[in-house]
Amino acid sequence: MKLLNEILGTKYPIIQGGMANIATGEFAAACSNAGALGIIGAGGMNADTLRQNIRRCRELTDKPFGVNIMLMHPQADEFAQIVVEEKVAVVTTGAGNPGKYVSMWKAAGIKVIPVVAAAVLARHLEPLGIDAVIAEGTESGGHVGEMTTMALVPQVVDAVSVPVIAAGGIADGRQLAAALALGACGVQVGTCLLASEECPIHPNYKAALLKAGDSDTIVTGRTVGAPVRVLKNRMSRELSLIHISEPTRR
């Protein structure tokens, strides 16, 4: 089995998660320069800012980098074209089926790596010609599925023949080793990079993350079909109570 760094041309078998409103071109470049695959998170951008961030990333690194596209984004079609025009090396996708874009991306030489939360979705996507798949467990930050990383990864490995990348709750070398033992070729990490000097979030947010323990996150939005793992604070607790008391409210 080839490791992820051999597939992507990076130093380490690590992808930086494409976190919306956080993973800018500058942050992605820093991650690529450190030996991972930096990913620009297009989720909080429009078409113009995405293009600007791609070009800024290219100014700051000569290493491979990619773009994450959330397919429910209203400008997903434009994003799909921009990554071709800007000759991005890798596209990761979430929140939808990338099928209508895969042939265009592949023709442009782009590696296509969707994020999945279930083996059935991985099986559905493999015939489209994807290069790998990210199996993301419920331990991850942000939008989550229901299956744990430990349970999900080997099921996806058994379900598809393309390389599988583990994600969700991975923060150190022990968890990377565990992912490889489960059959993954590498890992995607996000939350553990938030406290880095290069990450553009507010220092108070970094301090809260560093202070947080194993019971300091909460998943909101399950009752409205949009589960999201966030830090516990007054707002997330209140939001969780609203979802429980008014489950059909959107």
Question: Can you say where each PLM-predicted feature lies in the sequence?
Answer:
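Conserved active-site-proximal phosphate/metal-binding subdomains
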Residues: A151-S161, I165, A171-S245, R249-R250
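Active-site entrance/lid segments in N-terminal catalytic domains of soluble metabolic enzymes
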Residues: M1-P163
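Residue-level detector of alpha-helix initiation sites
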Residues: I22, I170-A171
